[in-house]
């Protein structure tokens, strides 16, 4: 990599070329494992689902592969789905006896119905706290909150 500017590692200008590529369909034929690309069968030994974000990391694509009977590497449907949902993941790990950091999971409706209650519970964790959407990938929507004065804005973002 060296001096290479990683900001150029984006689809950007190549998007029209990629979108204009051949259409591919998964075959739902359990006697053959492969893709149909422009009417031509292409056999597959295994799929490497190198994806990011919704439908890539949340178990959706893995479920599609399983329905189609296509072998793939990496996490399965449940592990992928749990990994995308932070609250469910922490509850699952805690239920298995694995220590997890203190957290509070709440929905938008819960927050709106009794904001003062949730502000007190969150403050009881101690500052700073991190506010993050439960089902957003990577660092999307994350805020480091140092006190109650900025908590509301972080939660409602």
Predicted regions and their residues:
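Acidic/histidine-enriched active-site and ligand-binding environments that engage anionic O-linkages
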Residues: 118-131
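Amphipathic repeat-derived elements
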Residues: 1, 60, 64-65, 146-157
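Glycine-rich phosphate-binding loop of ATP-grasp-fold ATP-dependent ligases
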Residues: 100-105, 128-156
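ATP-binding N-terminal substructure of ATP-dependent carboxylate-amine bond-forming enzymes
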Residues: 1-78, 82-95, 105-120
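Short glycine/serine/threonine/alanine-rich loop segments
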Residues: 70, 98, 127
């Amino acid at each position: 990599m060296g001096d290479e500017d990683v900001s150029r590692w984006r689809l950007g200008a190549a998007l029209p070329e990629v979108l204009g590529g051949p259409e591919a369909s998964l075959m739902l034929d359990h006697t053959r494992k492969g893709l149909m690309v422009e009417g031509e069968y292409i056999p597959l030994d295994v799929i490497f689902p190198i994806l990011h974000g919704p439908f890539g990391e949340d178990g959706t694509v893995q479920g599609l592969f399983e329905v189609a009977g296509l072998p793939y590497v990496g996490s399965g449907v449940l592990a992928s789905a749990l990994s995308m949902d932070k609250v469910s993941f922490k509850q699952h790990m805690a239920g298995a006896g694995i220590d997890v950091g203190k957290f509070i999971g709440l929905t938008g409706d819960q927050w709106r119905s009794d904001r003062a209650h949730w502000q007190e519970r969150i403050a009881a964790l101690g500052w700073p706290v991190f506010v993050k959407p439960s089902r957003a990938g990577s660092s999307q929507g994350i805020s480091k909150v140092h006190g109650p004065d900025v908590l509301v804005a972080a939660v409602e973002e």
